[in-house]
């Protein structure tokens, strides 16, 4: 895989101006993904790596979007502002985050935060994504039932991981209870299966 990614690194550098290279493989293995870490050249003295999770079999429901690279932090002033990259639509991300939260094997509080942000700040309506979630679950051979219950069941685990996993990633982390309640209201309103 390392050698097959060389052309990708070159294409990313050409398209975005960002220099990447292989760092290490992830210790955990999966049947439907390949996970590894890339190192990148940047201005920060701390760890300059990013985790990459390539899903091997996935159904995209919404078309990719062409978006400008955002420079949200002063420290990232070496990111080019005049480049664009292809990304998942916000609807695709919200559908995936909802399904990730409902997956018993996944316990990432970032999924909860992202879903909260998408529904509270980006205007994403989960009810409009129910069909997309059904398609994705059918593709995975999983039933589309009990999504909200599965997420509610994980409250204690997500709460326990909230600060430790997210506090260093943002300047103003909202309170877990506020975020969880808002997502629960959104799920009830969406009336998901």
Model-found features: residue ranges?
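Structured mid-to-C-terminal alpha-helical surface segments
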Residues: 1-193
